């Protein structure tokens, strides 16, 4: 697509957005051209909060399907569109409400903590929803002496266990992108770039390794933490150990820093399904509206509402 074609699509999208009083939300993993047209760019927590606060009549969520579903749970009176409704997530697809209910039978006093990367059905049987930005804080605040099930991300769960010392039963799910970011790869990059920090998302396999957690050159944190890090550090070189599309925003903010993706080709194929044409068509035809059964939505909202209290 030529730049002229891109600009024409931008103009069409802006016109449609104004006509329909719509707001465009995009995750940092979206294509750069999607990021540029978004009204709000953020990680899962930030976008969830924006979805609950916007005055727009329509929310167009440029993210995978569970993100659009979460926006609808938070803003039931808004029309929420997901340009690619079949854009999935290996984490969200890996957890089931049935599995959680089976665990509850064995642990009637247990607490279920679910990552935001889950379906509405899973959120509905969850006690606390979390994101990578607030998971540590929420788990630390849970009452002691009660069993905890954390899911679906086993790597994030193990990282939380290592940092907090809380024992948890872990669902064995994983993000296929971050599953390739191993301890061995991180150690290789530490040796190759001795002046660099490695910024690691806690969904990564490496984040579950205590030697990585304890290494002062390894900064483990949410997408927003990773993106903000070069702005609060004097170092010039950073290895980015997460989905590489975050470099679009990081490069824009920190043009004087050297930002090196740990796996430049390991991208989220689901996020890349969302294109400018698909965004334009979603607005034009108001298609792919997200619907959540009201009884299910109310149950799912409870776990999200508890998250917002932290």
Predicted features and spans:
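Active-site loop-to-helix "anion-binding N-cap" substructures in soluble metabolic enzymes
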Residues: 1-240, 246-310
């Amino acid at each position: 697509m030529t730049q002229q074609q891109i600009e024409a699509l931008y103009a069409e999208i802006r016109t449609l957005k104004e006509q329909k009083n719509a707001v465009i939300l995009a995750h940092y993993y979206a294509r750069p051209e999607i990021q540029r047209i978004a009204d709000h760019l953020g990680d899962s927590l930030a976008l969830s909060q924006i979805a609950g606060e916007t005055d727009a009549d329509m929310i167009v969520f440029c993210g995978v399907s569970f993100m659009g579903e979460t926006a609808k749970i938070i803003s039931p009176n808004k029309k929420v569109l997901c340009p690619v409704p079949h854009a999935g997530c290996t984490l969200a697809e890996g957890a089931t409400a049935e599995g959680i209910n089976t665990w509850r039978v064995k642990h009637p006093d247990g607490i279920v903590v679910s990552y935001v990367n889950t379906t509405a059905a899973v959120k509905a049987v969850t006690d606390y929803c979390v994101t990578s930005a607030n998971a540590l804080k929420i788990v630390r605040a849970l009452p002691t002496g009660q069993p905890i099930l954390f899911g679906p991300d086993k790597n994030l769960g193990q990282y939380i266990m290592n940092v907090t010392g809380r024992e948890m039963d872990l669902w064995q799910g994983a993000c296929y992108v971050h599953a390739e970011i191993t301890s061995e790869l991180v150690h290789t990059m530490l040796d190759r770039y001795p002046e660099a920090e490695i910024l690691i998302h806690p969904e990564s396999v490496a984040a579950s390794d205590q030697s990585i957690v304890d290494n002062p050159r390894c900064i483990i944190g949410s997408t927003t933490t990773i993106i903000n890090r070069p702005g609060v550090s004097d170092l010039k070189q950073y290895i980015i150990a997460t989905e590489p599309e975050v470099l679009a925003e990081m490069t824009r903010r920190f043009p004087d820093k050297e930002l090196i993706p740990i796996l430049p080709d390991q991208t989220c194929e689901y996020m890349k399904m969302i294109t400018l044409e698909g965004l334009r068509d979603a607005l034009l035809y108001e298609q792919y509206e997200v619907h959540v059964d009201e009884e299910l939505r109310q149950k799912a909202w409870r776990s999200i509402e508890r998250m917002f209290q932290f």
